[in-house]
A protein has these predicted regions:
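Active-site-proximal substrate-binding groove within the catalytic cores of carbohydrate-active enzymes
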Residues: 112-124, 141, 295, 305-313, ...
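Sec-dependent signal peptide cleavage junction
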Residues: 22-38
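Carbohydrate-recognition beta-sandwich/jelly-roll modules
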Residues: 101-459
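Hydrophobic transmembrane helix bundles of membrane-integrated enzymes that assemble
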Residues: 460-463, 506, 566-579, 680
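Hydrophobic membrane-insertion alpha-helices, especially the h-region
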Residues: 11-21
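Beta-strand-rich N-terminal accessory domains
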Residues: 34-43, 68-151, 750, 767-777, ...
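N-terminal Sec-pathway targeting helices
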Residues: 2-12
Length: 789
């Protein structure tokens, strides 16, 4: 039930835009309606600047570092006074002979070039080196020319616009190409600080590089950024860190958290296709302009790269809500594969100039997005553990140590089974909407009894469409609709479920309001974009518009409803299609909220819900919700099928298994039934079904829950059969971390767990055998002690 959202213009006019100091970008044109990120296109990287002619650049060869005079006995550089601004650097890779020691830990050593602030990190035991610039050994093979050759060598790139020119287009400039000067360079206790001065465009961007025990961090200090007459749009800091080109006999890939995760594999034949990956962390912000796309939102601010035995995993630690992930395959911009955060400071939006028409112009806001620090941490992996499973393991450790996630404690030896029960929905009638009953509270008890009678244990119920008016009636959720049994009927059902030790969560959406209840007035309480337009969602079933609720207004409503959930006896709330899943700024002056403030508001709702009721479930949750949720429902288990992305991987599932339970799509709505069942087994996901007591086809035409095959009686036998297989595969490893994942052969996948158990899934229509194991066609086996070498 994930939804796209659209914008509808309001009374905002051009005069308002001009008075607010907004920037005209180009003449009005057709306006895409759906909130998401732009598709791959070279122009999205920013038009090259003509600030300088391209310089041919030959990189200096690698050299041994000088003796560590600047290091203390403990191996860490002492803070040094700030140096004067450096002369403009040459258009070339930094000379490694001039690098100096900056910091050292037990595992790593940091070196820096005080002319460019480029750095390299050495793994002391293995001798492997990660550079913030292209590998000098591979650079002579680079054939790209012009501005992008300079961009690849630069420690920082910026995209900007000239606000004083109404015809200005966004341009990209590198610090090297813009006659860059390095100001205020100084060594610190953990690394170094410096300010990149773009002398042509007049940007000054202060940064820091600091080393941890097994990682290195890059930092941008937003509040110290200086702009001249031009307006900063985004920044890529050390974009080529860890970059690599294809090598024969060497496995290499980029990991992007698209959906469940995906690989961009290194390939020998570069096509010069300018396609690349670019996606907003936590999805698009509906308060700004977004192109239509089917790409999965980016839920986890993490990425990685492997080149042979050398690998890193990058984490956007702070400021990620204003970040995008940018990944370029080899051939897009030179021979190198690279992946980096793209930090957003301004973004485009549509300034409407009419009430009812979609006329207006695209523009950028005057104010920058600002957070205290924008931090990227690069964990450097050891040579023997450098695949994507090792990256996920390192990220999981980070979530436990720094984000408050805790290892899971299963309540039963049986795996969880999630039953979504649909109370009611509405569909279009002759004169007014028609109410469709799916499951009364009495019938809900019958569903539970049927599941228990068929041997399905460890059951959790999520009851949706219980509110007055059914699932598609948004706003004023309480009381429970009398046609389903009212509050008393719901209490009786929950009491019965509790007698069987079954928790009941009530499904709720506070993101939309279609009925004006709760004192909601769209004009006063609706979420607004930067032009002042009230934002609305278009229901694809009936094309009717529903107002998006201001996040702070929604938080107040959710908090006020907690006492009523508690009175019913609910064990928690399942937030779907909103809280914990979508993140938007709000320019409603009554409830103004930046993206950062909206994030904290959502975290507050989740925390209050858990404290009041004991449990919180979220649909396909973003990272910032994970430390509060008990369960992630309908977690993405595939990817967006970009043409340059090669294959999906269960990166998110490897991270989460053993920390929080998760399901994939409802089992009775699978498109490829057997393959998707096997994928759930491979990914360690638990079973979930959506049920009604009404017969199949009864919900046809409903605005939201229109699915045909939901009659629980049609699924009891199949659900019980699958539940046994889920228990066979996952019952013993509910609290175990996934430690490995690989292909044994085409369409034969192995998932390894702590303690030695492995699950081998064969998607082929023929049996698989390798002399150690035999896996039947379209089936799986469990190997308790793991595969022998």
């Amino acid at each position: 039930m994930s939804r796209n959202r659209v914008w509808v213009t309001s009374a905002a006019v051009t005069a308002v835009a001009l008075a607010a100091g907004l920037y005209l970008l180009r003449a009005p044109g057709d306006r895409p309606l759906y909130a998401a990120d732009p598709p791959t296109a070279a122009a999205a990287a920013g038009a090259p600047s003509a600030a300088q002619a391209a310089g041919a650049a030959a990189g200096a060869g690698a050299a041994q570092p000088p003796p560590p005079e600047a290091a203390t006995a403990a191996g860490t550089a002492q803070p040094q006074p700030a140096a004067a601004a450096s002369a403009a650097p040459r258009l070339a890779l930094p000379d490694e002979a001039g690098f100096r020691p900056a910091a050292e830990s037990a595992a790593l050593k940091l070196w820096v070039d005080d002319k460019t602030a480029h750095f390299k990190v050495e793994h002391k035991q293995s001798g492997q080196t990660w550079r913030s610039y292209p590998d000098p050994e591979q650079w002579p093979k680079e054939t790209i020319t012009g501005n992008w050759r300079n961009n690849l060598m630069s420690p920082i790139m910026a995209e900007y616009i000239d606000a004083s020119n109404s015809k200005s287009q966004a341009k990209t400039i590198s610090w090297l190409e813009d006659r860059g000067a390095l100001e205020s360079f100084q060594l610190t206790a953990g690394g170094f600080r410096a300010t990149f001065h773009f002398t042509g465009t007049q940007f000054k961007i202060p940064v820091e590089v600091r080393m941890k025990e097994d990682s290195v961090e890059t930092v941008i200090y937003d509040r110290e950024i200086k702009e001249g007459k031009l307006s900063l749009l985004n920044v890529k800091l050390y974009p080529l860190f860890g970059s690599a080109a294809y090598k024969e006999q060497e496995e290499g890939y980029v990991v992007v958290p698209d959906g469940s995760g995906a690989l961009i594999r290194f390939k020998p034949n570069l096509t010069n296709d300018k396609s690349f990956y670019r996606a907003s962390v936590y999805g698009a912000d509906s308060a700004f302009f977004n192109e239509k796309t089917a790409r999965n939102p980016l839920r986890l601010p993490v990425f990685g790269m492997k080149a042979g035995s050398r690998a890193f995993v990058g984490v956007m630690v702070s400021g990620e809500e204003y970040g995008k992930l940018f990944a370029a395959p080899g051939g897009a911009f030179g021979q190198y594969y690279w992946v980096t955060p793209e930090w957003q400071y301004r973004t485009k939006y549509f300034q409407a100039t009419g009430k009812k028409t979609q006329t207006g112009f695209f523009t950028y806001s005057k104010d920058r997005f600002t957070v205290p620090e924008r931090v990227t941490r690069y964990y450097l992996l050891e040579p023997g553990r450098s695949d994507y499973a090792a990256m996920a393991d390192k990220y999981r450790t980070y979530l436990i140590k720094e984000k408050g996630l805790k290892p899971l404690r299963p309540k039963s030896g049986d795996v969880p089974f999630y039953a979504d029960i649909i109370g009611a929905d509405i569909k279009k009638g002759l004169l007014w909407d028609k109410y469709i009953t799916g499951t009364t509270t009495t019938e809900a008890a019958d569903i539970v009894k049927g599941l228990l009678a068929h041997g399905i244990g460890n059951l959790t119920v999520q009851y949706a469409g219980w509110q007055d008016g059914g699932y598609s009636s948004y706003g004023g959720l309480f009381p429970v609709d009398s046609r389903l049994g009212g509050n008393e009927g719901m209490k009786r059902f929950i009491d019965y479920a509790h007698s069987e030790r079954i928790p009941v969560y009530l499904t709720a959406n506070y993101t939309l309001n279609s009925n004006g209840r709760d004192g909601f007035w769209p004009m006063f309480d609706g979420m607004r974009d930067l032009s002042g337009t009230v934002l609305e969602f278009e229901n694809p079933a009936n094309r009717e518009m529903t107002t998006l609720v201001s996040p702070k207004f929604a938080a107040r409503l959710a908090d006020g409803d907690l006492k009523m959930y508690k009175e019913l006896g609910a064990d928690g709330v399942y937030y779907n299609e909103g809280i914990g899943q979508y993140l938007n700024s709000d320019f409603n002056s009554r409830y103004s909220a930046s993206r950062s403030e909206a994030l904290q508001s959502q975290r507050g709702i989740l925390k209050q819900t858990k404290e009041a009721l004991g449990g919180v479930n979220v649909e396909n949750a973003n990272l910032y919700a994970l430390d509060q949720v008990d369960h992630i429902h309908r977690l993405a288990d595939t990817y967006s099928y970009d043409i340059f992305v090669d294959e999906p991987i269960p990166f998110a599932q490897i991270v989460l298994h053993g920390l929080v339970t998760y399901t994939s799509e409802w089992s009775n709505l699978r498109e490829q039934y057997r393959n998707e069942f096997l994928r759930s087994i491979e990914y360690g996901a638990y079973p979930a079904y959506v049920f009604t007591s009404a017969s199949s086809g009864s919900m046809k035409g409903a605005y939201s829950i229109w699915y045909y095959s939901m009659d629980y009686r049609d699924w009891l036998e199949k659900a019980a059969e699958e539940y046994k297989r889920f228990n066979e595969a996952l019952g013993a490893v509910q609290d175990k971390f996934i430690t490995g994942h690989r292909a044994l052969a085409p369409n034969v996948m192995e998932t390894a767990y702590e303690g030695g158990q492995t699950v081998i899934v064969n998607y082929n229509e023929q049996d698989y055998s390798d002399g150690r194991v035999r896996v039947p066609a379209q089936d799986f086996i469990v190997v308790k002690g793991g595969l022998k070498p």
